[in-house]
Amino acid sequence: SIADALIEHKDEIIKANNIDIEYGKEIGLTPSLIDRLTLGEDRIKGMADGVRKVSSLPDPIGNVISGNTLPNGLTVTRVKVPLGVIGIIFEARPNVTADAASLCLKAGNAVILRGGKEAINSNKAIAKIMRDAVEKVGLPKDSIQLIEDTTRQSSTELMQLSDYLDVLIPRGGAGLIKAVVENSKVPVIETGVGNCHVYVDKYADID
């Protein structure tokens, strides 16, 4: 399985990740961004555990959401089906490669991943491991694809592939999400930017 393969090849992932970390330091990434970029054994185990959790979820495909019978006797139902090919654009968090791919595969979709340049070596290592793993269980290797070109042009071109992509999901900061929403010809599922904080007054009743 993908989870087992990630654990088995953790040394390869860490080696590739170290290259990204050094590059990140060279270009002046903040300590918090370096932390997001870093993959140690614990985080790789966390990725594998996440894949296993997704795998253990009920199969969503084929579930009947609703239905009714028309006056002429015809029964109409709404059934969950795969979206098709999902594109995901994300930034310097290589764990997204495993998270996104496993979620897409679970729902019967193929995925095209486009990560940031800061994590390209980590992303390539993880994507290769996952592609090899799915092929071993009889799935098409290309059900998981990674765009290795990290220039702005590659993300711009991805946003224009309305004939090939069924939906595009940006995952990252407000700037990335805004750029995808405003420029994509592919339908976009707009995500939140994260970093949402809740302040709880010391006199609040938590219960």
Segments (PLM) and residue ranges:
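Short alpha-helical
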Residues: E12, N95, N121, Q153, ...
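Conserved NAD(P)+-binding/catalytic subdomain of aldehyde/semialdehyde dehydrogenases
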Residues: V85, L146-D207
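Residue-level signal for inorganic ion chemistry
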Residues: S1, G108, L168
